[in-house]
Amino acid sequence: MFTILLSLAILVFVPFLYKANRNTKDVKVNTISIDQKDGLPARKKLNILHLSDLHLENISVSPEELYHLTKDQPVDIIALTGDFLDRKRNIPKLAGYLNALQKLKPAYGMYAVFGNHDYVLKEEDFQRLKRVLEENGCITLQNEHVRIETAAGPVNIIGIDDYSTNRSNITGSYQSLENGYHLVLTHDPNIILDMKDVHYDYLLSGHFHGGQIHWPKPYHLVKMGKLVRMNMIKGLHYHHDKPFYISEGLGQTGVNIRVGSRPEVTFHQI
């Protein structure tokens, strides 16, 4: 009887795992359009390519595949919202993905913030990670901002450090900020609950992986903050009428499977 039950379990479980692993290769390319609400004359839109949570320990998409997924749209800005890796041996691997993104020739550059997994690294290894990003054309932001002049007008790219590891400094990130479109990059979207007193036009984040194993419900995310309990774990949401986006990410943590979620790259038209 035990042998029969074991055989049945294997017959069910092996195809399930196979499909769950295949899901990690089935990348969805989303396009999100954010309407202008500032009351000013209509301006030219910018196209932002947003990637999050590469988790190079468990990524099923090669740099070449990433390039082919994204090459058919013009790119103005590339935004990377953290959790590149958590093991130092994978730092060199990141360069291949950054080179693929540079081939897209973003008109106004590539920008990155860090996530909780990046901070698992020892300080010297974290600095190596940061160096690889910067040597491959990426501007890293840790509670700071940069201002860029675009065909759509000035854009302030505000990079707020990871909220889940208590590294966020909202006040410091906004210090001496001038007028313009305020685009916030951060890893953990829970930070929006502490941003009611500051303005942003759009915020990009990741962290939750869309649940990764979202079946029947992503109960394992409960410990990851209030937004989960508000059923905000992926996609476009509004808080106090301000839009923010939670990417499902490109890689996986733990086991390299996805159930009820898929890896994502997103184009945001702002």
From Swiss-Prot:
Pfam families assigned: Metallophos
Family (UniProt): Belongs to the metallophosphoesterase superfamily.
Protein name (record): Uncharacterized metallophosphoesterase YkoQ
Class of the enzyme per the UniProt entry, highest EC level: hydrolase
Keywords: Hydrolase, Metal-binding
Binding site for a divalent metal cation 2: 83, 116, 207
Gene Ontology molecular function: any one: UDP-2,3-diacylglucosamine hydrolase activity
GO term, biological process aspect, one: lipid A biosynthetic process
Ranges that cross the membrane: none
Organism name: Bacillus subtilis (strain 168)
Annotated binding of a divalent metal cation 1, by residue: 53, 55, 83, 209
Bound cofactor: record note: Binds 2 divalent metal cations.
Cofactor requirement: a divalent metal cation
